[in-house]
Regions:
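Charged, low-complexity intrinsically disordered terminal segments
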Residues: 1-180
Length: 180
């Protein structure tokens, strides 16, 4: 990209039964947009490893604001570390408070953000949240080698999440997102 340099994204490869959950989300979204159901291959092979995975679709029809609750619960349940990477940092009060509380408890809370803005207004909005994060010991880090577009979270080296949901109110309540 001429303006930003290389984009930093993270991709997930999923196998086994969890793929059907992703297909179902795709099917629901496709039907919502096109009012038709495409043919899908539903055959998935069971994964040999004993991995636990879940798919979390969120969006404006989600009455529970699930992504917001998941991020807040990740902060509340973390004991050692909570590392998040997101291109946008405009959390609501509940998520910001959970991040602050985690840091006060001694959790290593780090949020990796892009150095350059792709949406200036959102980038500028984040600065007020920096001022509410740094005094609590939350480490805000900048990615300099291009544009950081990944949306990932690591909790205590035992749980990880990655997908399309950002750390902002649009992803909490408005956008259709999927995280695994």
């Amino acid at each position: 990209d001429q303006r930003f340099g290389p984009w930093r994204d993270t991709h997930l490869e999923m196998r086994g039964p969890v793929v059907q959950a992703v297909q179902l989300v795709f099917l629901e979204d496709w039907f919502w947009a096109a009012n038709q159901i495409p043919d899908l291959t539903w055959d998935t092979q069971p994964e040999e490893r004993n991995q636990i995975a879940a798919i979390i679709p969120t969006g404006p029809a989600d009455p529970a604001d699930s992504w917001q609750l998941i991020v807040a619960e990740a902060a509340n349940s973390a004991r050692r570390k909570l590392w998040i990477a997101s291109p946008y940092f405009v959390p609501d009060e509940g998520v910001l408070t959970a991040l602050q509380a985690a840091s006060i408890r001694g959790v290593d809370v780090r949020i990796l953000l892009p150095e350059r803005a792709d949406h200036l207004l959102v980038w500028l909005s984040a600065f007020s949240y920096y001022e509410q994060s740094i005094p609590y010991g939350i480490r805000l880090l900048r990615y300099h080698r291009g544009f950081l577009h990944q949306k990932v979270m690591l909790i205590d080296d035992r749980l990880a999440a990655g997908g399309t949901a950002n750390l902002d109110n649009r992803s909490f309540r408005l956008n259709f997102e999927i995280t695994g």
